Every structure is written in C-alpha cells, then in structure tokens.
C-alpha cells in the first residue's frame, strides 16, 4: 500500500508508516507522476483536489489535515467512489489564540480595555464557539452571526450581519468559503460592509482570504477610513496584494491555525479515519507525539488583569513574530509558501503550566485554556 503525504504534515511519516509505504511530496504542486500507483493521498489546504488531479488514478482515499475543505471537490470524490476525511476543529484552538494575541497587542498599542469592546463573531462553528466561550469567560460582550445555524434551529442568540456591523467594535470572521448559494460568503465583507463599520473598528479575517474583498478593503484604507485590520488570509494566495499588506496592522501568511498541537490533531484525525477506512482502526494519544514545551512552569502572583494576560499570551505566542517576516519578503515569488513550510514551532496556551496564588486567577486561566493550578501563598 502506497500512501502519499504532504511533506509538511507533522508526524505523518511515523503514523502512516504503520499502514503502508509512505512517500512525502510537496503539496503545491503535487507531483502527478507519484499518483500513478498510490492508494491514498493526504494533503493540506494548499493542494487542490479535484477531477483534474485524480481522474484515472488509483487513489482510493483522500484525507486533508485541515478543518476547511473548500480546496477539495467532495462531490466529485463521492461520485468517483473515493473515500474522504477532513479534520474538523483540529486547529480551532490555535485560531482562537491567534485572535487573542492580535487583540491584546492592539489593545496595548492603542490603550483600550477589551472589556469596553463588543466583539462580533461571524461564523459560530468550531472556532467561533471557542472564541465566544473565552471572550465571555473574561466578561467581554459578544454578538453572534451564523445564518445557516440560525436557520437550522441551533442553540444561540444569533443576530443579523447588519446588526453586528452596526454594534460591534471588533468584527472577526470564522466562516467557510461558499462561492454561491443562499449562504454565500465570497466577499461577505464587501465595500458596503467595510464602509459601514464603526469608526475605529477592528476587522479580523482568519478563515479564508476571499471572505473579505481585498480590493475593496484597500480602497477604504487608502481613502483614510479609520480601521484596524488583522489579516491572516489573503485573496489569491500564495500571491497577495503587497500594497494591502502595508496598510494593515497585522499581516501573517495563513498560519493562524499553525500550532504544533493543531497540526498534530489534523494528522492524527486523518490517520485514524484512514486506518478505519482500510479496516485496521487505530487511535493515537496526542500527548504521546508532542515534545516538552519550551517553558515548563511559571508562577503568577495576584489577580489576572489585561496586562498580565497579555504577557502570558505573548509568552506562548506573540503574533508580531509572524507579521515582520511576511513584510520582509512580500511580493517575492515562493516566499509566502516558504514561510509556511519553515514555520517556527508554536505551542498552545495549554502547554504553559501556571502556578497561581490567587484562586480566581487560576480558575479563569483554566477557563481560557491554560494549564493552571492554585497554590496559596505562604
């Protein structure tokens, strides 16, 4: 059995070698010759999986180690009788922590408290729900918009996008990319929406680049609209609008979900799905794969305020470490993908063990996803 895996999927060689011969290949582009005698293909979001790639090939299963699936023609795979699995929610925690790192940086720079802001969350799936829970644990008001879930009767106080635009100080997008249909998200943030945002609002896109109309956004920024912008995703990736990058406050190369834990979850989820598909079901404990974190433990004295939270969050991950490298190489062919391929190891908040002498601080940190314990001061 021959299994092709994206060369940038961590732990893929070790895991899939339990099931057959593993060949690591670049994800963009996939070397077509390797598909001629392969049984399975494991990809990331950079690989377009469709009829033109796989027609006439012996591939029986495709796995994507990503939550999103807009790079995969699922309908054609089903028609062709090819098994498929994604990794829903694998990087949700990572994306939430990226948003927090960005907001805490902007709050410190601009001198505001997040408690004074209302956050509008567009898309309330694996990422949106987790973001809502962590924001509300901190006492930060949220507004939710998710028309498909609202129409299905899902639990939640869902509001219209227009209401979020009118009321939210921070608008953050966490939707799939739907190019048409009743729930179209292509250019969901169009020029009209962007111009309607509150003065001084923060716009965040960490889902799919084309959810925000990049041309319209640049037009508004060039005309002097007072707006802070965080973009992790871009229309036309791996190409991006270099002028737009110079205008945004934080710009990163589609790495919001790139924690070691998130990547490992993605790989293990598709590994487990494929092992079940071929009748040799196996399960993997995530902690058996992950290395020891850089910081073993730290001690926190007193209550948890916003400056302290910012220091803890940025101790684990400061978004500026990914903003600066992109600005240095923007516009140089191949560099966007190179930044992603050679991405520095990044951990999640759960990797940080925090000893608190304040019980309320320990409790709150646990709700936020840190590994915190209360040890009273002596």
Curated annotation (Swiss-Prot):
<comment type="function">
    <text>Catalyzes the oxidation of erythronate-4-phosphate to 3-hydroxy-2-oxo-4-phosphonooxybutanoate.</text>
</comment>
<dbReference type="Pfam" id="PF02826">
    <property type="entry name" value="2-Hacid_dh_C"/>
</dbReference>
<feature type="binding site">
    <location>
        <position position="146"/>
    </location>
    <ligand>
        <name>NAD(+)</name>
    </ligand>
</feature>
<feature type="binding site">
    <location>
        <position position="45"/>
    </location>
    <ligand>
        <name>substrate</name>
    </ligand>
</feature>
<feature type="binding site">
    <location>
        <position position="257"/>
    </location>
    <ligand>
        <name>NAD(+)</name>
    </ligand>
</feature>
<dbReference type="Pfam" id="PF11890">
    <property type="entry name" value="DUF3410"/>
</dbReference>
<dbReference type="GO" id="GO:0033711">
    <property type="term" value="F:4-phosphoerythronate dehydrogenase activity"/>
</dbReference>
<feature type="binding site">
    <location>
        <position position="232"/>
    </location>
    <ligand>
        <name>NAD(+)</name>
    </ligand>
</feature>
<comment type="subunit">
    <text>Homodimer.</text>
</comment>
<dbReference type="GO" id="GO:0051287">
    <property type="term" value="F:NAD binding"/>
</dbReference>
<dbReference type="Pfam" id="PF00389">
    <property type="entry name" value="2-Hacid_dh"/>
</dbReference>
<dbReference type="InterPro" id="IPR029753">
    <property type="entry name" value="D-isomer_DH_CS"/>
</dbReference>
<dbReference type="InterPro" id="IPR029752">
    <property type="entry name" value="D-isomer_DH_CS1"/>
</dbReference>
<dbReference type="InterPro" id="IPR036291">
    <property type="entry name" value="NAD(P)-bd_dom_sf"/>
</dbReference>
<keyword id="KW-0963">Cytoplasm</keyword>
<feature type="binding site">
    <location>
        <position position="258"/>
    </location>
    <ligand>
        <name>substrate</name>
    </ligand>
</feature>
<feature type="binding site">
    <location>
        <position position="175"/>
    </location>
    <ligand>
        <name>NAD(+)</name>
    </ligand>
</feature>
<keyword id="KW-0560">Oxidoreductase</keyword>
<dbReference type="GO" id="GO:0036001">
    <property type="term" value="P:'de novo' pyridoxal 5'-phosphate biosynthetic process"/>
</dbReference>
<comment type="pathway">
    <text>Cofactor biosynthesis; pyridoxine 5'-phosphate biosynthesis; pyridoxine 5'-phosphate from D-erythrose 4-phosphate: step 2/5.</text>
</comment>
<feature type="active site">
    <location>
        <position position="208"/>
    </location>
</feature>
<keyword id="KW-0664">Pyridoxine biosynthesis</keyword>
<comment type="similarity">
    <text>Belongs to the D-isomer specific 2-hydroxyacid dehydrogenase family. PdxB subfamily.</text>
</comment>
<dbReference type="InterPro" id="IPR038251">
    <property type="entry name" value="PdxB_dimer_sf"/>
</dbReference>
<protein>
    <recommendedName>
        <fullName>Erythronate-4-phosphate dehydrogenase</fullName>
        <ecNumber>1.1.1.290</ecNumber>
    </recommendedName>
</protein>
<feature type="active site">
    <location>
        <position position="237"/>
    </location>
</feature>
<dbReference type="InterPro" id="IPR006140">
    <property type="entry name" value="D-isomer_DH_NAD-bd"/>
</dbReference>
<keyword id="KW-0520">NAD</keyword>
<feature type="active site" description="Proton donor">
    <location>
        <position position="254"/>
    </location>
</feature>
<dbReference type="GO" id="GO:0008615">
    <property type="term" value="P:pyridoxine biosynthetic process"/>
</dbReference>
<dbReference type="InterPro" id="IPR006139">
    <property type="entry name" value="D-isomer_2_OHA_DH_cat_dom"/>
</dbReference>
<dbReference type="InterPro" id="IPR024531">
    <property type="entry name" value="Erythronate-4-P_DHase_dimer"/>
</dbReference>
<feature type="binding site">
    <location>
        <position position="66"/>
    </location>
    <ligand>
        <name>substrate</name>
    </ligand>
</feature>
<dbReference type="InterPro" id="IPR020921">
    <property type="entry name" value="Erythronate-4-P_DHase"/>
</dbReference>
<dbReference type="GO" id="GO:0005829">
    <property type="term" value="C:cytosol"/>
</dbReference>
<dbReference type="GO" id="GO:0046983">
    <property type="term" value="F:protein dimerization activity"/>
</dbReference>
